[in-house]
């Protein structure tokens, strides 16, 4: 992803194209409305908002939107902004855990959650500000935890999400188990991408389909009737 972004940026400069990645401030202006919707639909400010973090556009933008609501007097406090990254791609979570003043890029990030497989997030500093200014935190989850939560969300909620989206819910589970999140907190967890954004991951976990002859006896046999 990081090299692809560099190439696209170069292409925009040399060929006059318009970059709509999270480096684009107008994109963040759109993403900040997630914060507006949260407050509008809940009718209150949650204690915590948890988001998956890759390029860190969402967590930065939501924090910006909520700050605007605070400045306008629509809310009286900010929720704790909490980011979740994959263990193999976690420059922001590492900076939070180690108390680093800046995010140190990771040269070779690796995770099954491709949407957050980003070693040099363009909004890293904004994300650090969002987390630290609100008393939030950041954590990591393994690929195994991500895949397990992806299955749980589908089975228990009927929602198909891509692996990166499942990371945010898996992160809550991890933080609760570690005692970093109070069970009584009111939490909004953002799942950002649909299952069809990355269907190959789910297909790879499924048993191969059974092929039978087109007759009733073969069907009954396959169904163990």
Region annotations inferred by a language model:
Residues 1-21, 26, 68-160, 202-225:
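Active-site/ligand-binding loops adjacent to catalytic centers
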Residues 20-43, 70:
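A structured beta-alpha segment of the ubiquitous adenosine-cofactor-binding alpha/beta core
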Residues 32, 38, 42-64:
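Glycine-rich ThDP/TPP pyrophosphate-binding loop and its adjacent helix/strand module
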Residues 40, 64-68, 170-177:
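Short glycine/serine- and small hydrophobic-enriched flexible loop segments
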Residues 47-52, 77-84, 184-190:
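Beta-strand segments within the central parallel beta-sheet cores of soluble alpha/beta enzyme folds
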Residues 53-57, 123, 157-165:
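Short glycine/threonine-rich catalytic loop with a Thr-x-Gly-x-Asp
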Residues 169-225:
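Catalytic phosphate/nucleotide-handling subdomain of diverse soluble enzymes
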């Amino acid at each position: 992803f990081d090299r692809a972004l560099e190439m696209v940026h170069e292409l925009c400069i040399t060929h006059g194209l318009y970059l709509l990645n999270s480096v684009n401030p107008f994109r963040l202006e759109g993403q900040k409305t997630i914060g507006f919707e949260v407050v509008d639909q809940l009718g209150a400010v949650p204690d915590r908002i948890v988001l998956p973090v890759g390029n860190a556009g969402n967590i930065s933008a939501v924090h910006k939107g909520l700050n605007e609501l605070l400045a306008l007097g629509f809310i009286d406090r900010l929720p704790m902004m909490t980011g979740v990254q994959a263990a193999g791609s976690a420059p922001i979570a590492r900076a939070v855990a180690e108390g680093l003043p800046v995010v140190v890029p990771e040269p070779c990030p690796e995770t099954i959650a491709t949407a957050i497989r980003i070693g040099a997030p363009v909004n890293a500093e904004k994300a650090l500000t969002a987390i630290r200014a609100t008393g939030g935190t950041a954590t990591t989850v393994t690929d195994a935890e991500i895949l397990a939560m992806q299955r749980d969300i589908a089975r228990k909620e009927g929602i198909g999400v891509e692996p990166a989206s499942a990371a945010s819910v898996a992160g809550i589970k991890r933080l609760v188990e570690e005692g970093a999140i109070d069970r009584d907190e009111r939490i909004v967890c953002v799942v950002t991408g649909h299952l069809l954004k990355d269907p190959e991951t789910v297909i790879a976990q499924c048993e191969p389909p059974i092929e039978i002859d087109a007759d009733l006896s073969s069907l009954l046999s396959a169904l163990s009737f």
